[in-house]
C-alpha cells in the first residue's frame, strides 16, 4: 500500500507540487532554426594541457568523429495515387526517407500533395531566398496534372527537389523542412492524445518520431515533446515499463538542460513510474531535488498538461 511519503501515495506532496513553472520567455517553443550544438560547436574535447598520449588522443578523436557522424538522408518518391474528394481530385505523393550508412529499420513513409511542396517552397524562399538559387521547383501545370505521364515526371522532379534542398545546410536544419515532413502527423497524434485516443496517438507517434529524430539530429531535444507524449499514452494505457523506457530516451536527449520546460515534469513522471515498477528511484529523485533547489518555484504543469498544449494549430 502506498504511503503518504512515497510517490503515488494519497498524501504525497513531493515533486509535483514543486514542479517548475516557467517564465513566458522560457516556455516559448524553440525558434525555427532549432539552434542546438552540432559537431562544429562541440566543446568537450581534450584541452591543450591534456596529458593524453598520442594514441589516446587518436582514440578520443575517433570516438568524437563517430559520435558526431553526420546523419545523411535519402529521399525517394516511391509512388503516387489519385485522391478523389467530392469536388476535387489531386495526387498524393508517397515520400520515403531513408538514413544512409547503415541498415535503417525505421524507414519513414509520408504522403504529401503538390500543394504541400508549394507551401514549403514559398516558406523557404521567404527565409533563404539567395541560398536556393540552384534549387529548381517543379512548375505548376494548368492541365494534365492527373495524367500518368505528368505524375511520373513530377515524381522524379520532386525527388530531385528534396535532394537539392537537403544539400543546403541551412535548409535541412530549418524548422520549415522538418515541419514539412512531420508536422501533419504530429498534429494528428497530439489531437488524438487530447481526445483520449491513446492507442491511435501512440501508433502515429511511433511512426513519426524516428523521422523527427533523424531530421533534428543537430538538436537532440527537439523530439522531447513527442517522446513525452508517447510516455503519457503508454502510461495511460497501463504499459508502465514501456513508458519508463521512452522516458529514459527523452531524458538522454535533455541531458542536463534543467531550464528546458519538460525537464522537471518529465523527471516527476519518471519518479512515479520508477516507484510503480519497483525500480530504484534515488537517482531520479536526486536529479529532481537538485533541479528544484537551484530553481525554486511554485507548482508547474504536469507532463500530461504540457503535452496536450503542443501542436494546437
Curated annotation (Swiss-Prot):
Annotated Pro residues bias:
29-38
Q: Name one GO molecular function term.
A: phosphatidylinositol-4,5-bisphosphate binding
**Where in the cell is the protein located?**
Early endosome membrane; Cell membrane; Cytoplasm; Nucleus
Q: Which GO terms describe its biological process?
A: protein transport
Please give the GO cellular component terms listed in this UniProt entry.
early endosome membrane; nucleoplasm; plasma membrane
Q: Name one Pfam family in it.
A: PX
Q: Does the keyword Nucleus apply?
A: yes
Matching entries from InterPro entries are given as: PX_dom (IPR001683), PX_dom_sf (IPR036871), SNX20/SNX21 (IPR039937)
Q: Which PROSITE patterns match?
A: PX
Give the region (Disordered) as residue ranges: 1-61
Q: What's the entry's take on its domains?
A: The PX domain binds phosphatidylinositol 3-phosphate which is necessary for localization to the endosomes.
The name this protein goes by in its record: Sorting nexin-20
Q: Which organism is it from?
A: Rattus norvegicus (Rat)
Amino acid at each position: 500500500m502506498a504511503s503518504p511519503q512515497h510517490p503515488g501515495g494519497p498524501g504525497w506532496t513531493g515533486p509535483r507540487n514543486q514542479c517548475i513553472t516557467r517564465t513566458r520567455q522560457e516556455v516559448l517553443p524553440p525558434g525555427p532554426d532549432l539552434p542546438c550544438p552540432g559537431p562544429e560547436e562541440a566543446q568537450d574535447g581534450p584541452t591543450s594541457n591534456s596529458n593524453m598520449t598520442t594514441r589516446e588522443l587518436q582514440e578520443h578523436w575517433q570516438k568524437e568523429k563517430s559520435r558526431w557522424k553526420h546523419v545523411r538522408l535519402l529521399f525517394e518518391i516511391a509512388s503516387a495515387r489519385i485522391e478523389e474528394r467530392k469536388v476535387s481530385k489531386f495526387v498524393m505523393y508517397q515520400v520515403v526517407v531513408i538514413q544512409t550508412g547503415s541498415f535503417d529499420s525505421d524507414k519513414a513513409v509520408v504522403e504529401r500533395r503538390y500543394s504541400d511542396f508549394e507551401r514549403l517552397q514559398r516558406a523557404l524562399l521567404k527565409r533563404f531566398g539567395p541560398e536556393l538559387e540552384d534549387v529548381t521547383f517543379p512548375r505548376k501545370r494548368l492541365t494534365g496534372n492527373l495524367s500518368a505521364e505528368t505524375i511520373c515526371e513530377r515524381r522524379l522532379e520532386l525527388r530531385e527537389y528534396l535532394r537539392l534542398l537537403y544539400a543546403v545546410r541551412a535548409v535541412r536544419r530549418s524548422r520549415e523542412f522538418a515541419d514539412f515532413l512531420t508536422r501533419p502527423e504530429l498534429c494528428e497524434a497530439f489531437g488524438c492524445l487530447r481526445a483520449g485516443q491513446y492507442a491511435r496517438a501512440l501508433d502515429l507517434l511511433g511512426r513519426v518520431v524516428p523521422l523527427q529524430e533523424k531530421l533534428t539530429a543537430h538538436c537532440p531535444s527537439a523530439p522531447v515533446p513527442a517522446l513525452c507524449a508517447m510516455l503519457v499514452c503508454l502510461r495511460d494505457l497501463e504499459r508502465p515499463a514501456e513508458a519508463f523506457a521512452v522516458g529514459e530516451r527523452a531524458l538522454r536527449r535533455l541531458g542536463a538542460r534543467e531550464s528546458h520546460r519538460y525537464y522537471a515534469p518529465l523527471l516527476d513522471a519518471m519518479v512515479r513510474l520508477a516507484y510503480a515498477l519497483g525500480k530504484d528511484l534515488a537517482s531520479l529523485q536526486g536529479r529532481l531535488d537538485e533541479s528544484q533547489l537551484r530553481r525554486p518555484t511554485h507548482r508547474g504543469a504536469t507532463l500530461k498538461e504540457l503535452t496536450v498544449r503542443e501542436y494546437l494549430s
